[in-house]
Amino acid sequence: MRVKGIRKNYQHLWKGGILLLGTLMICSAVEKLWVTVYYGVPVWKETTTTLFCASDAKAYDTEVHNVWATHACVPTDPNPQEVVLENVTEDFNMWKNNMVEQMQEDVINLWDQSLKPCVKLTPLCVTLNCKDVNATNTTSSSEGMMERGEIKNCSFNITKSIRDKVQKEYALFYKLDVVPIDNKNNTKYRLISCNTSVITQACPKVSFEPIPIHYCAPAGFAILKCNNKTFNGKGQCKNVSTVQCTHGIRPVVSTQLLLNGSLAEEKVVIRSDNFTDNAKTIIVQLNESVKINCTRPSNNTRKSIHIGPGRAFYTTGEIIGDIRQAHCNISRAQWNNTLKQIVEKLREQFNNKTIVFTHSSGGDPEIVMHSFNCGGEFFYCNSTQLFNSTWNDTEKSSGTEGNDTIILPCRIKQIINMWQEVGKAMYAPPIKGQIRCSSNITGLLLTRDGGKNESEIEIFRPGGGDMRDNWRSELYKYKVVKIEPLGVAPTKAKRRVVQREKRAVGIGALFLGFLGAAGSTMGARSMTLTVQARQLLSGIVQQQNNLLRAIEAQQHMLQLTVWGIKQLQARVLAVERYLKDQQLMGIWGCSGKLICTTAVPWNTSWSNKSLDSIWNNMTWMEWEKEIENYTNTIYTLIEESQIQQEKNEQELLELDKWASLWNWFGITKWLWYIKIFIMIVGGLIGLRIVFSVLSIVNRVRQGYSPLSFQTLLPATRGPDRPEGIEEEGGERDRDRSGQLVNGFLALIWVDLRSLFLFSYHRLRDLLLTVTRIVELLGRRGWEILKYWWNLLQYWSQELKNSAVSLLNATAIAVAEGTDRIIEVVQRVYRAILHIPTRIRQGLERALL
């Protein structure tokens, strides 16, 4: 009974053990995921970077120096690539776009740079004795004669090449460029910016004509473009593409009206950072341009006044003919139609309120009037006629009416305080002759009056002055992103690594204690080497940045333009991005690989999604956002894993190196010797068995029965050869059995001898057989060749005979045919000759 109870208990224990083993097997069967590095994944992040410019080489005149310095830009790509991003939704915000700030800074720097080598007009900051230029007609008209006092003839004392001598000169100035010194005396004036700014005269051959500039992203960066036709500049865009450069943007410096820009593809679009905030500017993009033609009809002349060694001041000398006022013409029908479309959009935004357009509320001339550059002169046009209407339900209820053309009176200003900067002013030299220019109005800048929301009227005025809004009207659909080509994701693949395992210890292991320590010390510095590699890269980049700052500080000496600096910066950025990525790939042991497995296990705390949900349902952008908070941790673990791998390899190499001195005494070497010996013995035994079997088969074929391998049997003699006796000295035949031997070495020698003899006989027989076969094949081949040669000769002769027979038959047939033709011709000829004779005979018979 006791034995049966023990057996029952063992049965329960056996079942429990099997169940536990099955559970362990199931748990161990769960697939483990490992971190895999991917290079070149489509992931980007918003960033700010230095953009460089591209421009059409044929877009500028080489005779003059354009203020935009586009000759320093790279040529435009004749086939620009635009890649549409399917199923991508991206956020855009034109009001927080660093591209706008960068363009603003670039344009200001370009203007400043173009003025650096030009003449400073400090000697002209003297008292000017001015009087009004007499006009033949003082009628104030939009397109008639200029108002009295608009142009002043001023005389002043100027020091020329000799410092102690003063000479009196005169020049014509516009009213906007001078201010009275004393209100009591209307004859004493000074230049408008002398008390606040240093006035620099624009160089004579500088042109202000806007040239399209393409902003381009350096390598490692990209520009995203929103292609929604009704995009308001802020929010999500579902039609996104990536480009390397923007479209050509003309840096037109103007206020109130946007000139020569891009048009909306469908309806008019209005954009604002916040429509409820009346302090925010409203940018209007038209869908159809409105032509504006401007002219300065006065025929001006230009003269130069020397104000020092190598310096000249250019001013208006005389005005030939009538002094007529500059003006601009706009089609009233086109303008009213444009306002009607703008009103529709404004009423949608402001709850169908009455829309009122009115003139500017005041400020600097650049704000109050529509200012722009026309042919080198800076026009300031009164835009009251454009913004003087009330719209109720998209119908114009009141406003200035007139003929079909709106004529805007314009004034000209030569001293420009650009960009509202303090301490800097520019004097634009007068342009001789008449000036005409034509532009396209593609947008408006509006401001809304504040007040209580209960009012049913919204008043809008022309705005401007901040050139950033001009650039926003073109850059609203772009944003710069940084490409992040490195991505990590879980996979089932694991990197094969060198494990730290115990070596077999031989006699030389006694010396490996301290010798191996030297290798461990070198391997322990791998962390330090990693840090040094990172610091080295940072030092290179920092050195390049310092060099760029030095070049930028000394660019007036190096004659580098703003675009040249930006191109250098863009190249450095590209190199930096590449080096950074390659540095990480090298630290991780992934150099030159696009897909790199690692030995880092995937932690489900980073993401517990399954492989199918990751690889089949998520984009790289979504996955990057999923693990964004753990990316640095994963990078660190990959780096530590690679460091451990390199340390293991280093220690393994160290052990191999020092163990080689004592390899004859290492147990691994002796195991190798034993393995070779066993292989040799096994081979001999196998050969012995094979040849024994062959010998037995051979003997059986000859009529002998297989006996023991070591039994000596005398060969039987033939009936014609009787056996000899011991006393007789007859000749003995060779026995077929060998002599019995004793000992292992003797047996090996006999076997090897038999093996070599057997191999020799078999190879000889094989060689003889091959020789006979080759001889037979050669003989047969020669006979076949002779047969084919005879056959070829026979058929050649037959063909020759057939050809000769054919030619003979043809010749005979031709000869017979020729004879018949000749006979027919002769008969015809004789008949013709006999015709007169027949006629004569017929006449004779008739007469008889």
Curated annotation (Swiss-Prot):
Keyword tags: AIDS, Apoptosis, Clathrin-mediated endocytosis of virus by host, Cleavage on pair of basic residues, Coiled coil, Disulfide bond, Fusion of virus membrane with host endosomal membrane, Fusion of virus membrane with host membrane, Glycoprotein, Host cell membrane, Host endosome, Host membrane, Host-virus interaction, Lipoprotein, Membrane, Palmitate, Signal, Transmembrane, Transmembrane helix, Viral attachment to host cell, Viral envelope protein, Viral immunoevasion, Viral penetration into host cytoplasm, Virion, Virus endocytosis by host, Virus entry into host cell
Additional notes on this entry: Inhibitors targeting HIV-1 viral envelope proteins are used as antiretroviral drugs. Attachment of virions to the cell surface via non-specific interactions and CD4 binding can be blocked by inhibitors that include cyanovirin-N, cyclotriazadisulfonamide analogs, PRO 2000, TNX 355 and PRO 542. In addition, BMS 806 can block CD4-induced conformational changes. Env interactions with the coreceptor molecules can be targeted by CCR5 antagonists including SCH-D, maraviroc (UK 427857) and aplaviroc (GW 873140), and the CXCR4 antagonist AMD 070. HIV-1 lineages are divided in three main groups, M (for Major), O (for Outlier), and N (for New, or Non-M, Non-O). The vast majority of strains found worldwide belong to the group M. Group O seems to be endemic to and largely confined to Cameroon and neighboring countries in West Central Africa, where these viruses represent a small minority of HIV-1 strains. The group N is represented by a limited number of isolates from Cameroonian persons. The group M is further subdivided in 9 clades or subtypes (A to D, F to H, J and K).
Organism: Human immunodeficiency virus type 1 group M subtype B (isolate JRCSF) (HIV-1)
GO cellular component, as recorded: host cell endosome membrane; host cell plasma membrane; membrane; viral envelope; virion membrane
Domain characteristics, as noted in the entry: Some of the most genetically diverse regions of the viral genome are present in Env. They are called variable regions 1 through 5 (V1 through V5). Coreceptor usage of gp120 is determined mainly by the primary structure of the third variable region (V3) in the outer domain of gp120. The sequence of V3 determines which coreceptor, CCR5 and/or CXCR4 (corresponding to R5/macrophage, X4/T cell and R5X4/T cell and macrophage tropism), is used to trigger the fusion potential of the Env complex, and hence which cells the virus can infect. Binding to CCR5 involves a region adjacent in addition to V3. The membrane proximal external region (MPER) present in gp41 is a tryptophan-rich region recognized by the antibodies 2F5, Z13, and 4E10. MPER seems to play a role in fusion.
Matching Gene3D superfamilies: 1.10.287.210, Human immunodeficiency virus 1, Gp160, envelope glycoprotein (2.170.40.20), Single helix bin (1.20.5.490)
Intervals of motif YXXL motif: 704-707
Region described as V2: spans on this chain: 154-194
Protein name as annotated: Envelope glycoprotein gp160
